[in-house]
């Protein structure tokens, strides 16, 4: 795992955790908007490190590395943590372990529930193929296989593939969808998702509310998986700023 620092030391502390098949650079537009006001750390998940060979380990291992880093560098306290997809799953594990204090936690389309076991292997190989084609395909084949993707996401997948390749995608996917969030701790926990991923996201939101009735669910019209961060980083930045303006 790698930790990339941006912004202003001494300002409110913001931790960013990316998703499966992309790198920490997916956050660069958001970082550009917030670096004047926050002490920002963008995490690189093992298996998806930019320019570095690595292998995915486990949700618990990644969460443990984050906890250790925050304890060492930030006295065990973050003002805001934002996790996207796999990053949200890792963040939920950090909150479950309850070893550091996070004032505001954003789980953006985090998969908190396991899938039926029979479905995990076919889907993880399908997801691995998806990311492989992001890296290798151009022209007609790119259009045919990825008409449902937005271009910025394709570019991010290309960056991540060389690090852990298909094994990292398959191992990460299996780990995400065979683990269930059993408990969660935090003063302000938010779950975000877009309407275009509602079929998958709504059960996760219901599960979170069953564990933490005080959690806040935010639904973004017209947005797909990861699209709010990539298409509207200004809105994400504004919401983060609003969280900390009265702290």
Predicted regions and their residues:
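Catalytic histidine-centered segment of alpha/beta-hydrolase-like enzymes
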Residues: 223-233
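Short alpha-helix in the alpha/beta-hydrolase fold that links the catalytic acid
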Residues: 187, 201-210
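Active-site loop/oxyanion-hole signature of alpha/beta-hydrolase fold enzymes
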Residues: 41-82
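Short beta-strand/loop motif that positions the catalytic acidic residue
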Residues: 185, 191-193
């Amino acid at each position: 795992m790698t930790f990339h620092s941006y912004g202003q030391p001494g300002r409110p502390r913001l931790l960013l955790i990316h998703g499966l098949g992309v790198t920490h650079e997916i956050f660069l537009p958001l970082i550009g908007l917030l670096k004047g006001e926050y002490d920002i750390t963008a995490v690189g998940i093992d298996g998806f490190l930019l320019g570095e060979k690595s292998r995915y380990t486990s949700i618990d291992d990644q969460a443990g590395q984050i906890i250790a880093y925050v304890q060492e560098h930030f006295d065990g306290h973050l003002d805001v943590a934002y996790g996207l997809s796999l990053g949200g799953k890792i963040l939920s594990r950090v909150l479950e372990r309850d070893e550091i204090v996070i004032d505001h936690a954003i789980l953006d389309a985090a998969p908190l529930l396991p899938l039926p076991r029979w479905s995990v292997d076919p889907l993880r190989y399908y997801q691995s193929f998806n990311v492989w084609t992001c890296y290798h395909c151009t022209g007609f084949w790119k259009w045919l296989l990825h008409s449902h993707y937005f271009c910025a996401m394709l570019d991010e997948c290309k960056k991540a593939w060389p690090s852990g390749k298909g094994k990292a995608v398959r191992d990460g996917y299996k780990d995400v969808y065979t683990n269930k969030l059993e408990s969660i701790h935090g003063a302000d926990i938010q779950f975000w998702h877009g309407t275009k991923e509602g079929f998958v996201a709504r059960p996760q939101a219901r599960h979170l509310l069953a564990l933490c009735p005080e959690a806040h669910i935010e639904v973004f019209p017209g947005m797909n998986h990861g699209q709010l961060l990539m298409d509207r980083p200004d809105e994400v930045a504004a919401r983060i700023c609003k969280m900390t303006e009265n702290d």
